[in-house]
Swiss-Prot record:
The keyword Transcription regulation does not apply. It comes from Measles virus (strain Ichinose-B95a) (MeV). Interacts with the phosphoprotein (via C-terminus); this interaction allows C to associate with the ribonucleocapsid. Its main location: host cell. GO terms for cellular component: host cell cytoplasmic vesicle; host cell nucleus. It comes from the Viruses. Ribonucleocapsid-associated protein that interacts with the phosphoprotein (P), thereby increasing replication accuracy and processivity of the polymerase complex. Residues 1-45 are annotated as: Disordered. The keyword Disulfide bond does not apply. This is Protein C. Keywords: Host cytoplasmic vesicle, Host nucleus. Belongs to the morbillivirus protein C family. InterPro entries: Paramyxovir_NSC. Residues 1-15 have a biased composition (Polar residues).
Length: 186
């Protein structure tokens, strides 16, 4: 069979059906090497394991945490609305005179967390400046943020900003603040 066959695409190109001899040039007196004459099998590429970069794996983990955080925030929002409905009329009238209760601060924080996905120390400080004259409201805000920090799973706290991770696990500090708040308001 000749190297150049007639084919539809052109005269000078070899036909894809033509069998090529071995890579060694043919010399007079030698016969072509067939596939049965070859002693070694053709070299095969080894399959390589797919490697996922640490950065990609970290991004996937962060995305998964963000999804779980969104679910936790939705659950907290449902719980807060339920708590608000369970509040007694006496508590509501007392809080109206006072301003914000712990539950109201938690509802506000959860809404902010749902909308902006961040609770920052600067937001917390601004809220403290607004309610500064009232010691009880200040304690309610601190208590609400501490409770929220302990309700959200610890591995997701880093996604919520810098406020909640700094409050997580500071139970002794909160008890001390509550005692100070009660002693000054009494």
């Amino acid at each position: 069979m000749s190297k150049t066959d007639w084919n539809a695409s052109g005269l000078s190109r070899p036909s894809p059906s033509a069998h090529w001899p071995s890579r060694k040039p043919w010399q007079h007196g030698q016969k072509y090497q067939t596939t049965q004459d070859r002693t070694e099998p053709p070299a095969r590429k080894r399959r390589q394991a797919v490697r996922v970069s640490a950065n990609h794996a970290s991004q996937q983990l962060d995305q998964l945490k963000a999804v779980h955080l969104a679910s936790a925030v939705r659950d907290l929002e449902k719980a807060m609305t339920t708590l608000k409905l369970w509040e007694s009329p006496q508590e509501i009238s007392r809080h109206q005179a006072l301003g914000y209760s712990v539950i109201m601060f938690m509802i506000t924080a959860v809404k902010r967390l749902r909308e902006s996905k961040m609770l920052t120390l600067s937001w917390f400080n601004q809220a403290l400046m607004v309610i500064a004259p009232s010691q009880e409201e200040t304690m309610n805000l601190k208590t609400a943020m501490w409770i929220l920090a302990n309700l959200i799973p610890r591995d997701m706290l880093s996604l919520t900003g810098d406020l909640l991770p700094s409050l997580w696990g500071s139970g002794l500090l909160m008890l001390k603040l509550q005692k100070e708040g009660r002693s000054t308001s009494s």
